[in-house]
Amino acid sequence: TLSLHDALPIYPGQKRDYDSDYGGFTCCNGTGMENHVKYQAAAYAKTDDTLYVNLYMPTTVTWDEMGVSVKQETNFPSEHSKLTVNGSGDFTMKLRVPYWATAGFEVKVNGETICTNPEVSTYVEIDRAWSDGDVVEITMPYTLHLDKTPDKVDGSTVASLMYGPLVMVAKDDRETYVPMNWYTVVLSENLEDSVEVVTGPDAEDGSVPHLVTNGLHFYPMYDAYNYRYHAYVKVEETQSVVNKDQLQSLVDSAADALQENYGEDKIGRAHV
């Protein structure tokens, strides 16, 4: 039998436990099992002459009308996926470009690059006469972004730190919202400049992704177990974020103006 549980906890400093070692989930026992069937149903779609690849997961789809099958190989949370065509036929393959794949998305067919950096939330279209053994390789580097809630908490913006498709949670015992102030970390408009990627999604030793910023260590939500975590953090936005290159240009201009009046030996040039 399966025991019931209230929900997956996301309050500050919560800890996820399983109902039992082998007979329960962290929450949603019914829909938890249903998820996997839904993934299968949503992974691919087709029309008379087009195959849509919607999800990047280890699967094999058989297209009886076209007389082909496509095997997809990937190792979540890897940034890479490979599709191998079995059989031959003239059809279009459309590959989904995730909304978070904002840099470095690349598609190769039989080792030849056919597309780089397409528009996000669209499909890359490959229309060709496919042969048995054709290989499509997809690379989609994970990018960092904040997923903000519609409302604020005590006047502060609340958000989840996302790494590609992964919700990253901060490992921290505090039971109040932990703050992150990007301005105090680095004068930049890019999260990549203020978040250190300790372990990426393709770690050779199989380690899960690991990010560090503001002294906080972030791990994927799916791996958070038996410790207190924060799925949402307060993002301090009280000061304007300034582009580092723009700020350096302003400092250099001011230093040049001062040197004209006071001389090179009197002025020290600042660096940001």
Please give the residue ranges for each predicted region.
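Solvent-exposed beta-strand/loop surfaces of large extracellular or lumenal domains
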Residues: 102-127, 146-152
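Conserved small/polar residues in nucleotide/adenosyl-binding loops
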Residues: 2-10, 270-272
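C-terminal beta-rich recognition modules with glycine/proline-rich loops and embedded aromatic residues
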Residues: 7-84, 119, 128, 139-249
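Mature, Sec-exported extracytoplasmic domains of Gram-positive
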Residues: 95, 239-269
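Hydrophobic, well-ordered secondary-structure elements that form the walls
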Residues: 95, 136-138
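Extracellular interaction modules
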Residues: 1-6, 130-135
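Surface-exposed beta-strand/loop patches in extracellular or lumenal glycoproteins
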Residues: 84, 89-99
